[in-house]
Amino acid sequence: VNADVDASTEAEDTRYMRMALDEASTAASKNEVPVGAVLVHTTSGKILASHHNTVLAQDDPTAHAEMKCVRDGAAALGGWRHLRDTTLYVTLEPCPMCAGAVLN
């Protein structure tokens, strides 16, 4: 247990993860792969994007929750380089495509 993590940070993490889980539930209800993601600006706590997979609905193999959050977050912040001050909450380990986008 990290003693430096305060209760408010843990509560925020739990809140954002619950939002991601809600997105995953929405995906499941639409027969999509049940993955959800939420992108949060670390400094302000502002939610920049919240998505679920829509690969089937959009007939787009890149319409993963993580990719959609990265795209919307970059647009909201004025470019992908500004994503460094964000946290991405995802309901499972990202695939190689999404991991590459997140690490870039």
Task: Walk through the language-model features, giving the residues of each.
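Short beta-strand scaffold segments in enzyme catalytic cores
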Residues: V35-H41, G45
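Zn2+-dependent cytidine deaminase-like catalytic core
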Residues: T43, A49-N104
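Short, basic/aromatic recognition patches
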Residues: S8-K30
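Short, contiguous pre-domain boundary segments
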Residues: V1-S8
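Short, basic and Ser/Thr-rich N-terminal targeting/leader segments
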Residues: N31-V35, R84
